Design a protein with these regions (language model features):
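Conserved post-Walker A coupling segment in P-loop NTPases
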Residues: 49-121, 137, 145
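Conserved Walker
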Residues: 57, 84-88, 119-131, 144-145, ...
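Conserved AAA+/SF3 P-loop NTPase catalytic/coupling segment centered on the Walker-B
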Residues: 74, 102-113, 124-160, 189-199, ...
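Structural recognition of the conserved hydrophobic beta-strand(s) that form the central parallel beta-sheet
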Residues: 140-141, 178-185
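C-terminal helical "lid" of AAA+/P-loop NTPase domains
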Residues: 256-271
Length: 317
């Protein structure tokens, strides 16, 4: 269990198991993030501190290129909050991708803060708003740079005291206790109002895949291959040539692009190994954009291919 046991006697193994689960709740938070003790260590520590700060945490902004895992880290923050009693079991995680509203800024303002029936054409029913839906939980505004200044202004006014007005009801003031998390791929100082930025005390930059260590990149590759093996219900055997190509390739889309490359590679391998209990990944299974990438030494792809199981790969590299 890898926990400290303070009780000496248990009526059954089931009681011991339940005790261990209770004591260990939260002990593995963030630990399944590759880079937990490496490139992401300080970021994770700041995430924990941010969400734990009384009474309702401190707003946090994650900045970094697309595909670096910003959304995943925010989701882990919410898990951490639930597992450590910061959020109740009923607390909700509300994820809003602001880029979906880039061409309709009025709609996102209405959806965030709510509106009354008849407030505008098409408002056939009352809408409490996502800020109210997330009350007691977390509201994550992804691609926050897509918010128009008017919406940003209304947002930072809400952040001051937790009070706001619903569209179509200027007489009544509403309240919500919600933890706010933000993410952007842009330079926050260039796309966000200074008045909003001043209200976000925790601002962290997520490193691109190219800035992470070879070991972390290798572990990410193996993790994705393991996920695909579970998905297709077949053992995966991968050549050292393919592994080297995946490791040395440059990914503009970062972890997200690497995941897509591995899925396409496994798809090609599965198609070529239909009648086998396992799939064998060779260099021909790689997407052409990886095989013909100028950043990869061609000698890698013509080298002697040796197959490894995923366990062998983890032990070797």
């Amino acid at each position: 269990y890898n926990i400290k046991i303070n009780k000496l006697m248990f009526a059954s193994l089931d009681e011991l198991d339940e005790y261990a689960k209770t004591c260990g709740r939260g002990s593995k938070d963030f630990r399944d993030l590759i880079g937990y003790n490496g490139s992401l260590r300080k970021i994770i520590e700041s995430c924990k501190a941010s969400i734990s700060y009384p009474p309702h945490g401190l707003p946090i902004l994650l900045n970094g290129p697309t595909g670096t895992g910003k959304s995943f880290i925010i989701e882990k923050m919410f898990e951490y909050g639930k597992n450590n009693g910061i959020f109740s079991e009923k607390a909700k995680f509300v994820h809003v991708n602001c880029s979906e509203y880039a061409n309709n800024p009025e709609l996102i303002t209405a959806n965030l803060f709510g509106y009354k029936r008849g407030a505008f054409t098409g408002a056939d029913n009352d809408n409490p708003g996502l800020i109210k839906v997330a009350d007691g939980g977390m509201l994550f505004l992804d691609e926050v740079h897509c918010l128009k200044p008017e919406c940003q202004e209304k947002l930072f006014l809400f952040m001051d005291k937790g009070n706001y007005h619903v569209l179509g009801d200027s007489e009544n003031e509403y309240h919500s206790n919600v933890f706010l998390a933000f993410a952007t791929t842009e330079n926050p100082k260039e796309v966000l109002l200074k008045t909003l930025l001043r209200r976000i005390p925790i601002q962290m930059e997520i490193p691109s895949l190219s800035k992470r260590s070879k070991m972390e990149k290798s572990n990410i590759i193996v993790r994705f291959l393991e996920n695909e093996a579970k998905h297709i219900h077949k053992e995966i055997r991968i050549g050292n040539v393919v592994y080297a190509a995946l490791l040395n390739n440059e990914y503009e889309g970062n972890i997200g692009e690497l995941k897509n490359v591995i899925q396409e590679t496994c798809m090609n391998a599965l198609y070529s190994n239909k009648n086998k209990d396992y799939i064998e990944i060779n260099s021909l299974c790689l997407p052409s954009r990886v095989r013909f990438n100028n950043h990869i030494d061609n000698s890698i792809l013509v080298g002697r291919n040796q197959l490894y199981s995923l366990n062998d790969l983890k032990n070797k590299y």
